[in-house]
Curated annotation (Swiss-Prot):
The gene is rplK. One of its GO terms (cellular component) is cytosolic large ribosomal subunit. One of its GO terms (molecular function) is structural constituent of ribosome. Part of the ribosomal stalk of the 50S ribosomal subunit. Interacts with L10 and the large rRNA to form the base of the stalk. L10 forms an elongated spine to which L12 dimers bind in a sequential fashion forming a multimeric L10(L12)X complex. This is Large ribosomal subunit protein uL11.
Length: 141
């Protein structure tokens, strides 16, 4: 028989840098999860992903054990990395902060494809391009 699921915890943690400090510690502590064990496993699994922010979904079981699934980094994080900028524009319609090529958009869309609700690469690319435009990043050929 499968273990009884007690809850899910969704967090976004920098790759390889999970610590028992907030927000990780309190979120796991209230479900009775072994915080040190989670941070060790998460850091080992994401150590090769640099400074990207990694979304993680932790499944907590009734016996206080857990499992977790890491997702692909959020699209804005990947766009900022591709454009080498710190943040998007405060006024995306008026002030453009960077440019991104279609090839870079395609690369990001291919990486994000498992987590996107898109049927094809073209629709995934239009989602990523829309995110870029809303950040004040111009999509060029």
């Amino acid at each position: 028989m499968a273990k009884k699921v007690e809850g899910y915890i969704k967090l976004q943690i920098p790759a390889g840098k999970a610590t028992p400090a907030p927000p990780v510690g309190p979120a796991l502590g209230q479900h009775g999860v072994n915080i040190v064990e989670f941070t060790k496993q998460f850091n080992a699994k994401t150590a090769d992903q640099g400074d990207l922010i990694i979304p993680v979904v932790i499944t907590v079981y009734a016996d206080r054990s857990f499992s977790f699934i890491t997702k692909t980094p959020p699209a804005p994080v990947l766009i900022k990395k591709a454009c080498k900028i710190q943040s998007g524009s405060g006024e995306p319609n008026k002030k453009k902060v960077a440019k991104i090529t279609k090839a870079q958009v395609q690369e990001i869309a291919e990486l994000k494809m498992p987590d996107l609700n898109a049927a094809s690469l073209e629709s995934a690319m239009s989602m990523i391009a829309g995110t870029a435009r809303s950040m004040g990043v111009e999509v060029t050929e």
